[in-house]
Design a protein with these regions (language model features):
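Catalytic machinery of carbohydrate-active enzymes
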Residues: 1-337
Length: 337
């Protein structure tokens, strides 16, 4: 009998990217499965990229929480409940383990699976599942998601992660530009300007054009000041997510602060350097088929020399355009749990 599976993982961009290999694993072990996915409306594109996803069901928690008891929000929640209950699922798998995802799970029909008390980020969430699974907390997010799906559906996963983004990568011609993401919404995420200049100088010396990503006007303004002395700079601001993915897939390499788009670049198989200043890469390292380096840690920005070393390596990898898979490097010590 065909399994009907509902994935609950609503946000954010990088976290949704981490789930894609688990969907590939499910599809491999249950090729006839019907896989639906509940996601925040702003990120609905990402699940739709995976060919094994049957239906994307959107929610609007980010809007609802601002006016939870308004007639509009109540009406939208009722409509969501009506839609999600059209199918009785064999397994409802909460891959987020937060109380906001528990709210979604409680609207569904089906056996509810999630992380156990010791594995969940918000431990109280584990009390609302029919079946709880233990997954080691301090390990990369892609592995955690693959393990959780395997435990819930009763299989063993193997092989490198498949992000199923071939629609962006198959037949693409790599262009002579680097995608750079030097800005962030929080100051504690930023890397020093003089260090950025050293990295950008190296890219320009190798003849690469610069394409600069920014999430909003403020970030674009900061980035514009940073790159004002460089020729051949193009700003990628306000582009649809699908177009950003195409830009990343055709880049020689990407270097950026820890963000969902940096993780997307790695998932697309491009050489990617991630700069971590306010978060730890222990749980969220860059993961992909190309060369990756996750540098720095929470409160410990990576040194200029460490970044330039890996950037030189990425330049060599991208120049060769090798088809060999190379493992990502994570420069961080695992904290005690």
């Amino acid at each position: 009998m065909t399994k009907k599976i509902l994935i609950v993982r609503s946000s954010s961009l990088g976290d949704l990217v981490f789930v894609l290999p688990a969907i590939s694993d499910i599809a491999k072990h249950y090729p006839g499965a019907t896989i639906d996915w509940v996601v925040e409306e702003a990120f609905a594109e990402i699940p739709s990229w995976h060919p094994a996803v049957n239906r994307v069901i959107t929610i609007s928690h980010r809007r609802w929480r601002k006016k939870w008891w308004s007639s509009e929000a109540r009406s939208e929640r009722a409509e969501f409940k009506k839609i999600v209950r059209q199918t009785k699922y064999d397994i409802v798998l909460d891959m987020q383990a937060l109380m906001k995802s528990v709210w979604v799970v409680r609207q569904t029909l089906g056996e509810r699976h999630g992380l156990d008390w010791k594995s969940a980020r918000e431990r109280i969430a584990s009390l609302f599942y029919n079946k709880r699974h233990h997954v080691e907390f301090w390990q990369p997010a892609v592995i955690r998601q693959r393990e959780l799906a395997a435990l819930a559906l009763g299989y063993s996963y193997e092989g490198p992660p498949d992000f199923a983004l071939q629609a962006f990568t198959d037949g693409v011609e790599i262009q002579n530009y680097a995608v750079v993401m030097p800005s962030a919404s929080r100051d504690d995420k930023l890397w020093p300007e003089e260090d950025w200049h050293a990295a950008l100088d190296l890219l320009v010396e190798h003849g690469l054009e610069l394409r600069v990503l920014a999430g909003n006007a403020k970030e674009a303004e900061r980035a514009a000041e940073l790159v004002k002395k460089y020729p051949n700079v193009e700003f990628l601001v306000g582009l649809p997510l699908k177009e950003v993915a195409h830009q990343l897939a055709a880049a020689r390499l990407m270097i950026g602060l820890d963000s969902g788009l940096t993780h997307l670049s790695a998932a697309l198989g491009r050489p990617t350097i991630g700069i971590y200043c306010a978060s730890t890469p222990v749980r969220t390292p860059l993961t992909g088929a190309g060369m990756t380096a996750s540098l720095g840690d929470r409160g410990v920005p990576p040194s200029r020399d460490a970044v330039l070393l890996k950037l030189n390596q990425a330049l060599g990898e991208s120049k060769e355009d090798s088809s060999e898979e190379t493992s990502g490097e994570q420069v961080a010590k695992q904290p005690e749990f």
